[in-house]
């Protein structure tokens, strides 16, 4: 993979429902060269913070702008307008 990044977005769905959404988006993620490494929910349950990996930034943009992906995310309770790539990530370790 080419790059890793930290992202965030707001949501109205449960964390469990969001995990189901991620499973259903797997074909589109594969198509655009994306992989989620880690995700956590904010303490108040309103946001997700994730670490992802992508072959290219173009793939991330294509995934996030795909009309089918956008609709699936909206239907699941994701506030797509709040989506933010916070930072690129270099080295990291999961303990």
Question: Which residue ranges define each predicted feature?
Answer:
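Short S/T/G/P-rich N-terminal loop/turn motif that feeds into the first structured element of a domain
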Residues: 1-70, 76, 80-95
């Amino acid at each position: 993979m080419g790059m890793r990044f930290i992202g965030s977005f707001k949501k109205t769905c449960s964390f469990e429902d969001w995990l189901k959404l991620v499973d259903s988006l797997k074909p589109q993620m594969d198509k655009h060269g994306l992989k989620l490494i880690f995700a956590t929910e904010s303490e108040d349950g309103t946001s997700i913070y994730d670490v992802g990996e992508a072959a290219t930034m173009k793939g991330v943009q294509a995934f996030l702008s795909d009309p089918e992906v956008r609709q699936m995310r909206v239907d699941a309770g994701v506030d797509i307008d709040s989506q933010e790539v916070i930072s690129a990530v270099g080295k990291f370790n999961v303990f």
